[in-house]
Amino acid sequence: MARLAGVAALSLVLVLLGAGVPRPAAAAAAKTQVFLSKLPKALVVGVSPKHGEVVHAGENTVTVTWSLNTSEPAGADAAFKSVKVKLCYAPASRTDRGWRKASDDLHKDKACQFKVTVQPYAAGAGRFDYVVARDIPTASYFVRAYAVDASGTEVAYGQSSPDAAFDVAGITGIHASLKVAAGVFSTFSIAALAFFFVVEKRKKDK
C-alpha cells in the first residue's frame, strides 16, 4: 500500500511539473503569421542575369543586390536586423505544379523554396554572389528578399520582377567522370571475359 501511495505521489509531482513546461505545439502556434500582401515593399532587389538568360546549377554565379527603397520615409528600416534572400519559381514554372504553389501566407508558400543567403542588414545597400546550388531544378526563377526583425519575423520585402525571370539549367544525366569510370569498367569487363574465354578454350583443347 505504501508503495502504491509513493507511486501516486511521484505521478502527481510529475504532472504538476509538466504543467509549467510550454508544449512544442504551443510554441509553434506562437510563431507570428505573416502575409506577403501585408508587408511593405520597402526593398529594391536586383539580379545579374538578364530576362531569359540561362545559368547552370553548380557552375554559374548570380549576383543579388538589395537596398532600401528611396521612397521610404526616414527610419523605415529601424527594425531591420537581417536580410533573408530566397530563390523563387517564376509563375510560368508554377503552372499545374501544386508543390510549387505560391501562397500569401509565408508559412504555406511553396514558390520560394530555396535559401540563397541571410545577411546582417546594413543601411545603404547589400550584395551577395550566389553560386547556384547543384540541387536547383531546371525552371525559371526570380529572387525575393525579406527584411527580418530581431524576433526573426519578416517585416518588409522586395523582389526582382517575376516577369523578367532568368532560367536555371539543372544538373541532369550522368556526370562526365562517372561516364569515364563506367567506360573503363566496361572495357575491363570485356577484357576479363576474353581472357577467361581463352583460358577455358585452352583447357578444352588439352
UniProtKB/Swiss-Prot annotation:
One MF term from GO for this chain? nitrate transmembrane transporter activity
- Could you list this entry's UniProt keywords, alphabetically sorted: Cell membrane, Membrane, Nitrate assimilation, Signal, Transmembrane, Transmembrane helix
Q: Which GO terms describe its cellular component?
A: plasma membrane
The UniProt record lists the keyword Cell membrane: yes
- UniProt main location, coarse: membrane
**What GO terms in the biological process aspect are recorded for it?**
nitrate assimilation; nitrate transmembrane transport; response to nitrate
The UniProt entry lists membrane topology as: Single-pass membrane protein
Name its cellular compartments: Cell membrane
**Which is one Pfam family of this protein?**
NAR2
Q: Tell me the InterPro entries matching this sequence.
A: Transptr_NO3_Nar2
* Annotated tissue distribution: Expressed in epidermal cells of primary and lateral roots, root-shoot junction zone, vascular tissues of adventitious root primordia, stems and coleoptiles of germinating seeds.
Q: Which signals induce this protein?
A: Circadian-regulation with a peak in the middle of the morning. Induced by nitrate and sucrose in roots. Down-regulated by asparagine and aspartate in roots.
Signal sequence residues: 1-27
**Would the keyword Zinc be found if you checked this record's keyword annotation?**
no
Bilayer-spanning residue ranges? 180-200
Further remarks about this protein from its record = Plants silencing NAR2.1 have decreased nitrate uptake in roots under both high and low nitrate conditions.
Q: What does this protein do?
A: Acts as a dual component transporter with NTR2.1, NRT2.2 and NRT2.3. Required for high-affinity nitrate transport. Involved in the regulation of NRT2.1, NRT2.2 and NRT2.3 expression, and in both, HATS (high-affinity transport system) and LATS (low-affinity transport system) activities in plant roots. Imports nitrate with high affinity when expressed with NTR2.1, NTR2.2 or NTR2.3 in a heterologous system (Xenopus oocytes).
Which protein family is named in the record?
A: Belongs to the NAR2 family.
How this chain assembles, per its entry, is:
Heterotetramer composed of two NRT2.1, NRT2.2 or NRT2.3 and two NAR2.1. Interacts with NRT2.1, NRT2.2 and isoform 1 of NRT2.3.
**Full protein name:** High-affinity nitrate transporter-activating protein 2.1
* Organism name: Oryza sativa subsp. japonica
Q: What is the lineage of its organism?
A: Eukaryota, Viridiplantae, Streptophyta, Embryophyta, Tracheophyta
